[in-house]
UniProtKB/Swiss-Prot annotation:
Keyword vocabulary terms for this entry: ATP-binding, Ligase, Metal-binding, Nucleotide-binding, Queuosine biosynthesis, Zinc
Residues annotated for Zn(2+) binding in this entry: C189, C199, C202, C205
CDD domains: QueC-like
Biological process, per Gene Ontology: queuosine biosynthetic process
GO molecular function, one term: ligase activity, forming carbon-nitrogen bonds
PANTHER family named in the record: 7-CYANO-7-DEAZAGUANINE SYNTHASE
Protein name in UniProt: 7-cyano-7-deazaguanine synthase
Amino acid sequence: MTKRAIVLLSGGLDSATVLAMARAQGFETYALSMRYGQRHSSELEAARRVAAALGATRHEIIDLDLRRFGGSALTDDALAVPTDGASDGIPVTYVPARNTIMLSLALGWAEAVGGRDLFFGANAVDYSGYPDCRPEYVAAYETLANLATKAGVEGDRFRVHAPIIDMTKGEIIRAGIALGVDYSLTVSCYQADDDGRACGVCDSCRIRRAGFEAAGVPDPTRYQAAA
């Protein structure tokens, strides 16, 4: 019997690894990306490349303009993207309810195509300030999924997977390399240019670069300038 999984795919390093993990577990993968008004829209081109390279059965990009709400440095040009490392509290790069919105879209698609597994790249190590990247959030969303759907209330339960939630960036990279992920296809930078070249100074770039160093793997990231 075919097992189908919906995988949230941003085009970044973490979600590419999660897509490879879902495939390695024998799932037929359906990749879901969202054009939500993010600064770094070149990540969607990266998502297309990654979905093709990792053999996703389908890849859908949903338009939902969260820039109309603002509230995040990723969707509001008046808020600066931080470049000075981790800060106390919830980072300004947190997009209000983004994971909940995207998981809900994934849940609807999963029920429509007969999938019962949702995968996403939540990580509580690098992004410990994000409320929707915590283990208790993952557990709570799985409970919601099974309360809010026809399949769930009929006993055909959904499972929400966050396989990299406790992994360091170096561990994630090593796992992805073992599964054949080509990280040169990915874009992680919050301020990547239209060609997908990274700024080299934002927090996401800093974490990504440190991850490749920790993994002992050459960094394939293309930078806008020496950084």
